[in-house]
Amino acid sequence: MRRCAALLLLAALLLTGCGASGTEPARETAADGRTLLTMGVLSTGSEARQFASLFNARSEEYKIEVTEYRYGAAAGRTPDTLIMQLAEGEGPDLLATTGTDFTSFERSLVFVELGPLLDEFADELVPGVYEALKGQHGIYGLPTGFGVWTFITSPSLVGGQESLTMDEARQYAAALGEGAAVFDKWLTRSEFFKRVLGFSAGSFIDWETYTCSFDSEEFLDLLELCLEQRADDSPLPEEDLRLLHSWLLTAPGWFGGGLQKGGDYCFMGFPSDEPGPKGWLTTDGQVFCAVASGDTEGAMEFLRFVLSPEAQELVESFPVLQSELDRRTDTAVQTQLMSEADAAKLEGLLSPGLRSSDVPNEIYFILTEEAQACFAGDCTPAEAAARMQDRVSTYLAERS
């Protein structure tokens, strides 16, 4: 109830702001006469500081002033408090974060939707990343880089196939020997469910009609699949004989050549009846532009700079700019950290596109809560799915 009241107050504040009259106050200027913009950084390791420094050295019109802008018990702020401050124009013009603190519905009230900005760079971005982002229900945080959750296996273990159905995966796993499983045995039911949500949750929500289908047979099958993993409170298995190994592909690991040294590997998507994406998108750093910013044009200019070659060169993750990804790949091949075949495997992972869960935190918590009750034996998968459907349907209806 407290959260609902906060959101109602937030909407009222924004409506009041929309109806305000008069001229906007003059923007603060730096000592050199440039328009001053503020950027709050929520993580000490954020690359945003480097972006701001480089931008300031290039821009003749704007200057970014970076400040720590944290929330938590020590700071006396909650995420809701920060959202309210941003709506009132008391927060920074830009907000850089490395977490997923703002994957909620209220983001559309306080942050600028960045779909048009991405469209400007459509021909320059990694196609799979661009398409995954455009498939989301609004783009409010500009990713500075990305990673990919996927599964890896040995081509020799799957007959050289590029995709598997669940039945095929079970057959290949059985061929490994007694006690072998399809997925990592160390994954608990809850941990495995997180991967299920990451790869498929978005496909059970229709954002055009604000409806969902978590009571479908397909989702029920996924819940039952999770029950095949070890219980959350069970000890770690002594051995982990499995067909598919859950893998977060990061730029440092990939360009460092660690995975490639083994040689016999391939990327595999979540088993499905239809071939499709082999991985799902993860975004580390994101930069948001506040709706209440007094100089949205200047803030957008900075975001365009973040997508420039010189800024993308600073990104530790996989860069979202295709030319920078190509440059790093060429360098890795030339220095023999990977082969041309390795480069082709990365292309094969990205080219079919990437999944994007696009599930607001509130829905994620609903699904996780009901799933954990099922995994603990408090209800059947069908009962859990029915409760998920009811609660998420209500949530979506209230916001349609």
Regions found by a protein language model. Give the residues of each.
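Extracytoplasmic "Venus flytrap"/periplasmic binding protein-like
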Residues: E61-L125, R242, L259-Q260
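A bilobed periplasmic-binding-protein/Venus flytrap-type ligand-binding module shared by bacterial periplasmic
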Residues: F151-S156, T282-E297, L314-S317, E324-L325
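Short, polar/charged alpha-helical segment
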Residues: S43-K63, T67, T103, L367
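Short, well-ordered beta-strand elements
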Residues: A31-T44, Y62-Y69, L94, Y140
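Extracytoplasmic/periplasmic substrate-binding proteins
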Residues: E224-G298
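Long, aromatic- and glycine/proline-rich binding clefts that accommodate carbohydrate-like moieties
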Residues: E316-E369, A373
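Helix-loop-helix "hinge/cap" segment bordering the ligand-binding cleft or interdomain interface
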Residues: G115, L133-P235, E297, T380-E383, ...
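Hinge/lid segment of periplasmic solute-binding proteins
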Residues: T97-T150, D264-F270
